[in-house]
């Protein structure tokens, strides 16, 4: 029974180390984002431009169809 606990303990230990390293990197990234407002603008553009483009792609053909009545 002890032999089956060793690998589990090792996996748990390695997992906690990975999580702590990821948290440190995430905290560092958040600090950098707070410092640079231009990056925030870029992130906002990345979020909203695809949304606007997809909405336009859906509605422009419908509007064009209604205007020209060639549906």
From Swiss-Prot:
A GO CC term attached to the entry: extracellular region
InterPro entries linked to this entry: Antimicrobial_frog_1, Frog_antimicrobial_propeptide
Disulphide bridges, residue numbers: 65-71
Chief location: secreted
Propeptide: 23-45
Any Pfam family the entry gives: Antimicrobial_1
Lineage top rank: taxon: Eukaryota
Keyword set, alphabetical order: Amphibian defense peptide, Antibiotic, Antimicrobial, Cleavage on pair of basic residues, Cytolysis, Disulfide bond, Fungicide, Hemolysis, Secreted, Signal
TM stretches of this protein: none
Signal peptide boundaries: 1-22
Function: Has antimicrobial activity against Gram-positive bacteria and fungi but has weak or no activity against a range of Gram-negative bacteria except P.faecalis. Active against the Gram-positive bacteria E.faecium 091299 (MIC=19 uM), E.faecalis 981 (MIC=19 uM), S.aureus ATCC 25923 (MIC=1.2 uM), S.carnosus KHS (MIC=4.8 uM), B.licheniformis X39 (MIC=2.4 uM) and R.rhodochrous X15 (MIC=1.2 uM). Active against the Gram-negative bacterium P.faecalis X29 (MIC=4.8 uM), is virtually inactive against E.coli ATCC 25922 (MIC=150 uM) and inactive against P.aeruginosa and S.typhi.
Official protein name in the record: Brevinin-1HN1
